[in-house]
Amino acid sequence: HAVHLDPVKGAQAIFLSEFLYRILTAPLPDEHLYDHLASSLTFWEGLRRGGANYHLCLLISLLPVLGISPEISERPEGAGWCFSLSEQGYVLDRHAHCLSPEETLHLPQLLRMTYANMHHFAYSRQQRGVILDYLLDYYRLHLASFPQLKCLPILRQLGEAELEGKHLPSQP
């Protein structure tokens, strides 16, 4: 499906353009990164359906390419362990950059998401939003000068308006 004919792909395109603009700041070309992006975007372009998780999958697939993949070892025994986005490991004392204990249980499965299996991850729009927020927080913590993305509040407002059947005011 062409991006302009698919509202999900259209929203993803807006998000991906700003996200990629922010991560493609290296002064020297990175052939591995560009090859990965080329194959990922070619896959996305060919998607006919089941692409609601594509943006999450792309962000996850870029973690090892950018050298910031979290080390997910076996979670320690006992209750209350959280995964710290800033420390890239499990902690008992939850802080601002931690997943909840329940979210921590799902992290290893999420990080196994690939383009081939992403359609099996049945997340609601709200769950995808939470996952996206955590992924972007992780990028901000581990990539120097990675800012808040400006398109997200706008895309979320558009998504909420679409769900409620509202039309946003047009600009003169």
Predicted segments, located by residue:
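Non-catalytic alpha-helical scaffolds and adjoining flexible linkers that form interface surfaces
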Residues: H1-P172
